[in-house]
Every structure is written in structure tokens, then in C-alpha cells.
Amino acid sequence: MEKQVQISDSTINYEVFHRNIKYPRMEFKTGRLLLILPDNYKDYNDIVEKHKDWIYRQSSKIAKALEEAQNKRLELRRTDEEFKKLLYSFVEDISYELKININSIYFRRMKSKWGSCSRNKNLTINTILKYLPDNLIEYVIFHEMIHLIERKHNDHFWKIIANRFDNYKEIETELFEYWLLIQERMKPIQSEGNMYNNLPQVTR
């Protein structure tokens, strides 16, 4: 069910979903507000009203990020083979640096992550990472492989990240902007005969 709410100078679209959950929650997915309610919960207007300041702040943040994203360029000409070669090179270098071995690398469409790394040392890469600049691909791989040292995003984790990427906060912001850019520009694009067909709706 699609709705709208007017907050200050912004008209914000949102969707209401009912699920088998205990408590209501709100989340933004690539610029769109989702209101997820328990099956028997009806008063969604009350929740929106109570959290309108938070909704406005998040919506403004996303709008600003999307504006910044318009100046960025996607690597549309990079082939699957070129992407894999680059990625394997980064994995090899980072493995040597961290003294960590990766067992397997998988590629698949992921709706909410750039990648993941399991306790079994399996690295899963979101196929849309192909369209990012080299330095961001390297950062994502390093970020995921650090989870073999520290599973949580705690102070220890970010200290390790900062030792190699002292500007990691700016990089994280840039990655968020690329999420939005891909959502806006890449969803309609399909290239026949490769594993990047039917790009997912990117979420963050």
C-alpha cells in the first residue's frame, strides 16, 4: 500500500507492509521509506507522525547523497572477465597482507550488501560491484575480509580498517552514493548473455 506524507518542504512517499512480526518498524531502502507493521496493526499514521523528524532527516540525507551521486561515473564497459581478474588480484594481495586465506569466491545478486565473508572463509561478492571504481572494489574486499578477524562492526574492526584506509568514513559515504546511483540508473539495463542480467533493486 503506497502512501504520502508532507513533512516541512518535502513530500515523502512510503509503502506500508503487514508481516508476521511482533513490533512495527521503519526503514529506508534506497531512498524509499518502508513501514513494516504486525499483521493486526492498523494505525500507521500514528507511527509516521511520531517519527516524522527522523523521517525528514533520513530523507534529506538521501536526497543530498543522490545529488552528489550524479557526478559519479559507473564502470559500464568493464567486462566480467576484467572484473574477476581485478577482484582476484585484490583478494590475493589482501590475503598476503592479513595472512588470511579465502577458500572460495562466489558472485551473486545481493539486495542489501556489497559483499559478505563467512566464518568458513567464503567470500561472496555482489555482482553490481563490477560497476564501481577500482579503489572502492578494493575497499569492499578488504572490509569483508576483515570480518575474518573481527565479526562485528565495533571499535576494533574500524581501527583495523583505519590503519589501511584512514579516510574510510568518506569511502563509506561514497559507497552509499553509488548504491543510490545504481538504483537510479542501472535497474533498467540488461546486458544479454552475462551474469549481470536483471540487476537487483539495490538496497542499503
Where do the language-model regions lie?
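Walker B catalytic acidic pair
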Residues: 144
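Active-site-proximal or metal-binding-adjacent scaffold patches in catalytic folds
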Residues: 1-139, 148-204
